Amino acid sequence: MARVCKVTGKRPMSGNNVSHANNKTKRRFLPNLQSRRFWVESENRWVRLRVSNAALRTIDKVGIDVVLADLRARGEA
């Protein structure tokens, strides 16, 4: 399963670990993904999404119906 948020599209990015001696080694910054179930009142069912914490805030703000409509418009749900 890819580490990609279904709503925001956030995915891992690369960067460096930097030691006190300023040595640099490559690392990955992973998105804060959560598997959550959302109750969709209009469809009277649960929807399971793997979303980032930022997407959870978006869903709280605009509502799950708006987010699902956007996903369906993009052809992802």
Swiss-Prot record:
Key words of the record: Ribonucleoprotein, Ribosomal protein
Gene Ontology CC, one term: cytosolic large ribosomal subunit
Parts forming coiled coils: none
Gene Ontology molecular-function annotations: structural constituent of ribosome
Superkingdom of origin: Bacteria
InterPro entries: Ribosomal_bL28 (IPR026569), Ribosomal_bL28/bL31-like_sf (IPR034704), Ribosomal_bL28_bact-type (IPR001383), Ribosomal_bL28_sf (IPR037147)
Region (Disordered): 1-26
HAMAP family, A to Z: Ribosomal_bL28 (MF_00373)
UniProt family annotation: Belongs to the bacterial ribosomal protein bL28 family.
Name of the protein described by the UniProt record: Large ribosomal subunit protein bL28
